[in-house]
UniProtKB/Swiss-Prot annotation:
Residues 1-19 form the signal peptide. It comes from the Eukaryota. The keyword Ligase does not apply. GO terms for molecular function: ion channel inhibitor activity; toxin activity. This is Conotoxin Pu11.1. Its main location: secreted. It comes from Conus pulicarius. The cysteine framework is XI (C-C-CC-CC-C-C). It is found in: Secreted. Belongs to the conotoxin I3 superfamily. Keywords: Disulfide bond, Secreted, Signal, Toxin. GO terms for cellular component: extracellular region.
Protein backbone atom coordinates (compact mmCIF):
# COMPACT_ATOMS: atom_id res chain seq x y z
CA UNK A 1 0.00 0.00 0.00
CA UNK A 2 2.84 2.39 0.83
CA UNK A 3 4.42 1.62 -2.54
CA UNK A 4 1.20 2.57 -4.36
CA UNK A 5 0.96 5.83 -2.42
CA UNK A 6 4.61 6.62 -3.18
CA UNK A 7 4.07 6.01 -6.91
CA UNK A 8 0.94 8.19 -6.94
CA UNK A 9 2.80 10.95 -5.12
CA UNK A 10 5.70 10.79 -7.59
CA UNK A 11 3.31 10.92 -10.55
CA UNK A 12 1.51 13.92 -9.08
CA UNK A 13 4.78 15.76 -8.54
CA UNK A 14 5.90 14.99 -12.08
CA UNK A 15 2.63 16.25 -13.55
CA UNK A 16 2.87 19.46 -11.52
CA UNK A 17 6.43 20.13 -12.63
CA UNK A 18 5.56 19.37 -16.26
CA UNK A 19 2.51 21.66 -16.09
CA UNK A 20 4.61 24.52 -14.75
CA UNK A 21 7.15 23.99 -17.49
CA UNK A 22 4.45 24.05 -20.15
CA UNK A 23 3.05 27.29 -18.73
CA UNK A 24 6.49 28.87 -18.83
CA UNK A 25 6.95 27.77 -22.43
CA UNK A 26 3.54 29.21 -23.34
CA UNK A 27 4.42 32.55 -21.74
CA UNK A 28 7.73 32.55 -23.58
CA UNK A 29 6.03 31.78 -26.90
CA UNK A 30 3.48 34.53 -26.32
CA UNK A 31 6.18 37.10 -25.60
CA UNK A 32 8.17 35.96 -28.64
CA UNK A 33 5.09 36.13 -30.88
CA UNK A 34 4.29 39.64 -29.66
CA UNK A 35 7.87 40.79 -30.27
CA UNK A 36 7.88 39.26 -33.76
CA UNK A 37 4.56 40.89 -34.54
CA UNK A 38 5.68 44.33 -33.38
CA UNK A 39 9.16 44.25 -34.90
CA UNK A 40 8.62 41.96 -37.88
CA UNK A 41 7.24 42.77 -41.32
CA UNK A 42 3.65 43.89 -41.50
CA UNK A 43 1.43 40.81 -41.39
CA UNK A 44 -1.24 40.50 -44.05
CA UNK A 45 -4.73 40.27 -42.63
CA UNK A 46 -7.12 37.93 -44.39
CA UNK A 47 -10.69 38.95 -45.11
CA UNK A 48 -13.84 37.03 -44.25
CA UNK A 49 -16.99 36.43 -46.27
CA UNK A 50 -17.87 39.48 -48.36
CA UNK A 51 -14.50 41.14 -47.66
CA UNK A 52 -12.92 43.18 -50.44
CA UNK A 53 -10.31 41.25 -52.42
CA UNK A 54 -8.49 41.11 -55.73
CA UNK A 55 -6.70 37.76 -55.20
CA UNK A 56 -7.59 34.48 -53.45
CA UNK A 57 -4.73 34.97 -50.98
CA UNK A 58 -6.53 38.02 -49.55
CA UNK A 59 -9.35 35.76 -48.29
CA UNK A 60 -9.25 33.65 -45.11
CA UNK A 61 -9.17 29.86 -45.06
CA UNK A 62 -11.22 28.15 -47.73
CA UNK A 63 -12.74 31.36 -49.09
CA UNK A 64 -12.05 32.35 -52.69
CA UNK A 65 -12.02 35.83 -54.19
CA UNK A 66 -14.97 36.42 -56.50
CA UNK A 67 -13.63 39.79 -57.64
CA UNK A 68 -14.01 43.33 -56.31
CA UNK A 69 -17.80 43.34 -56.73
CA UNK A 70 -18.39 39.95 -55.01
CA UNK A 71 -15.59 39.82 -52.45
CA UNK A 72 -14.50 36.72 -50.54
CA UNK A 73 -16.99 33.87 -50.82
CA UNK A 74 -17.20 30.13 -50.19
CA UNK A 75 -16.70 27.90 -53.18
CA UNK A 76 -17.37 24.21 -53.79
CA UNK A 77 -14.59 24.07 -56.37
CA UNK A 78 -10.95 24.84 -55.50
CA UNK A 79 -9.83 28.45 -55.88
CA UNK A 80 -8.05 29.33 -59.12
Amino acid sequence: MKLVLAIVLILMLLSLSTGAEMSDNHASRSATALTDRLLGPKASICRGTGGRCTKDKHCCGWLCCGGPSVGCATSFAPCN
